[in-house]
Structures are given as C-alpha cells and as structure tokens.
Swiss-Prot record:
Disulfide bonds: none annotated. InterPro entries: Aa-tRNA-synt_II, aa-tRNA-synth_II, aa-tRNA-synth_II/BPL/LPL, Asp-tRNA-ligase_1, Asp-tRNA-ligase_1_N, Asp/Asn-tRNA-synth_IIb, AspRS_core, GAD-like_sf. Belongs to the class-II aminoacyl-tRNA synthetase family. Type 1 subfamily. L-aspartate binds at residues 170, 216, 448, 489. The record marks 31, 80 as: Important for tRNA non-discrimination. It is an enzyme of class 6 (ligase). Aspartyl-tRNA synthetase with relaxed tRNA specificity since it is able to aspartylate not only its cognate tRNA(Asp) but also tRNA(Asn). Reaction proceeds in two steps: L-aspartate is first activated by ATP to form Asp-AMP and then transferred to the acceptor end of tRNA(Asp/Asn). This is Aspartate--tRNA(Asp/Asn) ligase. Residues 194-197 are annotated as: Aspartate. Residues 575-589 have a biased composition (Basic and acidic residues).
Amino acid sequence: MLRTHLAGSLRAEQAQQTVTLTGWVARRRDHGGVIFIDLRDASGVSQVVFREGAAAEQAHRLRAEYCVKVTGVVEVRPEGNQNFEIPTGAIEVNVTDLEVLNESAPLPFQLDDQAGEEARLKYRYLDLRREGPGHAIRLRSKVNAAARAVLAHHEFVEVETPTLTRSTPEGARDFLVPARLQPGSFYALPQSPQLFKQLLMVGGIERYYQIARCYRDEDFRADRQPEFTQLDIEMSFVNQDDVILLAEEVLSSLWKLVGHEIKTPIARMTYAEAMRRYGSDKPDLRFGVELVECAEFFKDTTFRVFQQEYVGAVVMPGGASQPRKQLDAWQEWAKQRGAKGLAYVLVGEDGTLGGPVAKNLTDTEREGLAAHVGAKPGDCIFFAAGTTKSSRALLGAARGEIARKQNLIDPDAWAFVWVVDAPLFEPTADATASGDVALGYSAWTAVHHAFTSPKPESIDTFDTDPGSALAYAYDIVCNGNEIGGGSIRIHRKDIQERVFKVMGISHEEAEEKFGFLLDAFAFGAPPHGGIAFGWDRITALLAGVDSIREVIAFPKSGGGVDPLTNAPAPITAQQRKESGVDAKPEPKGDAASAKPDAPADK
C-alpha cells in the first residue's frame, strides 16, 4: 500500500507516530510561511502541516485536488487550534516528505461550493469526491450488504437472470439491442425479471433474489431514470403474509443503518380506504389531514357545482389568512392537474364563512359545514366535485401541498404502511390517461401486471365482473413514496388464460408471446409470490436526499442523457451495417416459438 493510515482515522492516541497518507488537497492555507493542507481521502480529512525543508518548498505549488502522498509525524494540535467539528480535529501531521502523485487542472467548480446539476453530472468523478455524493454511494453499498445478509440467513439463492431477451410490444417501451448474427432482429433489455423469476419457482429454486438492473424507455418524467435497480424477491409455497413478513425484516435491517427501528408489524390499509381517506394509493402518514366525503351532506344542495357523483373536502389549517393572490394560485394549480378549479370556503375567526362558495350555500349548510369537515376558525376548506376518482386524486394532491405549505411534515419522521386489496383491473382509458402503457386490447388492463393472481374470493368472478375483482397484491409505502410492491402470482394455466382474455389477449397471441410460461405452468408449477423494492428510491430516502440521481454513481439527466459520456450518440455507418439495424428480418416459420419478457414487476 502507498499509505500506512487513512486520513480520517488519525486520533490523539497516535501522537508521535510516523504515518504516510495519500489523498487529495481539499484546502490550502498559508500562514506566515507555514502551509496547512486539508488532506482528504475516502475516510475523511486530516490537517497536514509544512513548516520547513524541501517538503515545505514543494508545498508552495500545491493546488486544489492535487493527488499527493505525505509522510510525517502525528502531533497534537496546540491548545485553541483544535477543530472539534471533525473526528481528526485534535491532531495534525507535521510533514517531512511530499510526493505529488498527480496534478489537477483548474476545477470546473469548487468542490466545497454549490454547483449546477448539469456540471455535477458532467464531472461526476469530481462530484463524487464531495462528502454528500460520496457518502450516498457508500451507503448504497451498505444497503446492498444488509439486504443480502437477511436473505442469506433465510437461505435465498441469488440468481442472475438474462438481460438480453425478447421485446413485448404491449408492455412499456423496451430498449432494443440489434442481434448482429440475425440482421433485422432485436433483443430487448428487461423491464424486470418477472417471468424469469417465476420460471425459477417452477424450476424448484423456491427462494430467489437478485439486485436487478431494469430498463424502461419512458418519456421523461421528473426523477425517473431509464435504467434503475430493484431488489427482486420470489418465494414458493407462500401466501401474502409470508412475503410481507420477510419484506419487513429486510426493511428493518435497512433502516437500522440510519438508526431507526421500524415498528413491526407495519400497519395495513386497503386500497379503498387509502383512496377514501387520503386520495392516494401511497399516502403520506406523517401528518393527519384527511379527506372528508360531503356528498351526503350536500345531497339537497341547490349549488349546482356540488350536484355531482362525488363531493369531498380537505381542510387547510390556518389557511383562511391566505391573501387573494395565493387563493387564485390554488386555482391555477388545480387547472394544471386537469380540474376546472378548486372551490374553497374560508372560516373566519368568529366562525363565519367567507369566499365565493359560501354565498351559494343554504343557511343549514353554512351552519353545519365546519363541524362536518372538522374545520376550526382560521381554516380554509377546499372542495372537489365530479367523478369520484378524479376528485379524490385532486384532493389528495391538495393534501400534500397543504402539508408542505403549512409545515405539517416532521422531516425526521418515518411512516410506513402496506396498501393491500387493490383492484385487479382498471379501465384501459384510465391507464393510458395517466401515462401508463396498457397491456392488451380490451376495455380492461391489469393494474399491477398480467401475472398477479386475483384474491381467492375473486377467482370465480374476475372475468365476469372485472371491475370488482381484487388483486392478491401489496405495496409498501414510506413517507408517501411507494418503495416496493409485489403480489401472489398466478401459477395455474387456466387462470392465466382467463386473465389474458379479460385483457383482450387472444389464445393465439398468448401462446405466441407467453407460451413458454403457460407451458411451464402445466408441469406442476407451485404457488408462489414475491416483491420488488425500488432500490434507488429506498437508498435516496435513507440518504436524506430528494432525487434518486444522488444515490446512483453515474445517473442520467433529463431525457435520459448522460452529460459525462454524451450518451446516447449516433453510431457510424459501419456500425449500422454490421449490426443489421436497418435490415429486414427474414420470415421465420417458427416465429411463434419465440417468447417475450414481461412488463415491469410490482
């Protein structure tokens, strides 16, 4: 090794020891001919001092981020010169020998200053030298190790599934890879290991996991990455409770890394309850504001706006003091979400109701409204009226905005909840309207994916009454973020074919695209289920950062662009020719025997 000690490991107990350190010049200060350098390596920072001799002469040319090796004696700093903000603040190293391992060009940004994200990603190798980004990547490694330890204890088998497979045009868009040896044909990068892990269960592996790289060619959305990571788990001969029990053990081990003890069992909430109370299937439970249903309260109203299928309200504590400009801004906020506006009533300090809606209410409605919704003097009541789904979604979003504006969220709190009993199917129009890519060609598509089992009570009726069928699925939510989701899978061919039929996938198409899975189900496929955790989001939460880009070593920026390597980039004419990217595939008689990968798992 070029060094004897790590810079961040030195303490007063090592005084008078001769040590050799390596690292980068973080800061340089000259004081009357004495040069002080903050030397940084992965472990931390030590102050090194050049007082006299050849080493001190050399030190005059040191600049920020020079890579150096120093040898010297550990000394206790003089009284009054200690820096108790860092672990090494009681000592310094009196340097006797200096070797410059490599110089540094002028920096595009100072590492101890704020920098724009584009510059940080373009020079990510410099950004990673900073304490925050470096800590996030090291934390991610600990997260991986903690999960592996739990799963190894339970005798899970880590299996690598293929990353070159076949495209599924009905799923989310795939990244395609030309097959040079079969011009005109393409592999697809997997959106998840879903079907392969199910085949592992058929193969008798019984307990599988993988820290899996997944790929989705999606339109740009904030804080999404085209390549991402999930902890993928599958188990045979289990029910929902078994998977949840293991998942809670994994999560507990992860949150212990940041000193938090998760109280288990984690509470469960049905999808219907989450939507009714919070307007979201991933509710943030760190604050207590809830939606209040008002359709019954306004059943005899003469106010046409409230003569709707659904009328609901959410209270903004202290919101009555908002200026008119802010109340108008709420209307624009609602319109950006596809609503016509956000009706409101202001509750005065004397209990009287104000605002444009109040004058349209009857005396009886005005007298009972505050009590019905739980509003106090000084509060603002926001309303949504229309279809149940869209109105609840608007109020749920307003609930989150209220919490942020009124500082209702404890930033140090952790609130976990399982959301269970979601619908098995949703109208295809709803899925496409929300930006999802619907699988199948009928009026119904899968909420999770096509391989999720119906709940036992829905097995006999899900194809005759798709709108009422419940999924044998479970999502884990932390602080309003869905950090994982899974389900008990279909393991019987007849049930899988019935699900495909509901989704408008014909028998012939199912055989062509998923025949290998259907064939496998015919050979004693065991009951099985699993879960996939969003590894980037979990690590971001643990690291206390807002964006998943902060916990990915080399992330993409907006639109999937990599500022560091300038990827994606055009390929040469020779590469196009060799790859066969422009070739038309030859017709194949056995095309129906080729099989696809599946949509992303939850």
